[in-house]
Amino acid sequence: MTDLQKVLLALLLSLSLAACDQPGGEVPDPVDPGPEEPDDPMEPGPIEPDPDEPDPIPEEEFLEDSEGREFSYVPVGDLLPNSGPGHQDTTIYRPDILFPLEDAAFLNSQVYRYGGSQGSLNGMEGWQCETSNYDYPWQDTFCESRSRSQIMCPDGGHEGVDIRPATCIPESGATHWAVAVEDGRIVGLDGSKYTVRLQTEDGTLYRYLHLKMNQLAVADGQFVTKGQRIGKVSNDFYNSAGDLVPTTYHLHFEMYQNYAPDEETDPVFDQVNPYMTLVNAYEKKLRAQ
């Protein structure tokens, strides 16, 4: 290689190096391209809903009658000691009936409490106007011991429940009205000494006992509407011989329906325990006052 060729080669190398240099200083750091995008990005999944808030615990309901007394009741079938086996039936047979008395009322025993012939069995000697007879809690008297045969009570028993009115009538002299629990017709009244029967269109039968029979507000065969007055609470009662029998001032209330204890047994038309049906009706009455 000649000297001229060496000079030209050196010049070319110098020009190539100059072209690669960055004018003004340092070479910048390379830019990070970041993660590569996937070829087939996944679709976002469904958004998980927030868990449901737990239902609030309902507040306990306290109901009071017109005198400010708090309503309460002993469980169905839980009778006074020494008064009978009771009948455990929580069925509300007629949820829409009206309570059969216009005013406040107290369900409890007329025989095994103060004023009753067997009150001494529970240390309740005294007369029927004893204050505790006219207070809560209610207590069931269906299947209370009696000599009468009753399909619900294998040993015989009380066919309905006993309801004291708001006040003790011999002491207060007040009038307390019994009313129709449903629309219906008064049946079998002629010749009846102490019972008024109300039958509904579907055959359900109610019996009201011990009303003041010579001052009834209804007649035999009369159609009545729910809430219509039937008669005044009293103590009319007679034995099978027609003799007057003493009893306390109260309404004895019965309900007859087709009843079968299970699916294998044919139903019979007989008394059913109205206690829980009346509890339901009374609670509705207190809420509406």
Language model: regions and residue ranges:
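Bacterial N-terminal signal peptides that target proteins for export
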Residues: M1-L8
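Ser/Thr-rich, Pro/Gly/Ala-heavy low-complexity intrinsically disordered linkers and tails
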Residues: P23-P54
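Hydrophobic alpha-helical targeting segments used for export or membrane insertion
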Residues: L9-L13
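Surface-exposed, glycine-biased beta-strand/turn segments
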Residues: P54-Y194, K226, Y282-Q289
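Small beta-barrel nucleic-acid-binding modules, principally OB-folds
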Residues: G156-E171, T200-T204, M255-T265, V272
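Conserved, short, structured surface segments that act as functional micro-motifs
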Residues: Q199, Q222-Q289
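C-terminal motif of bacterial Sec signal peptides marking the signal peptidase cleavage site
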Residues: A18-A19
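Zn2+-dependent peptidoglycan hydrolase active-site motif and core
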Residues: G156-H158, S172-D220, Y238-H250
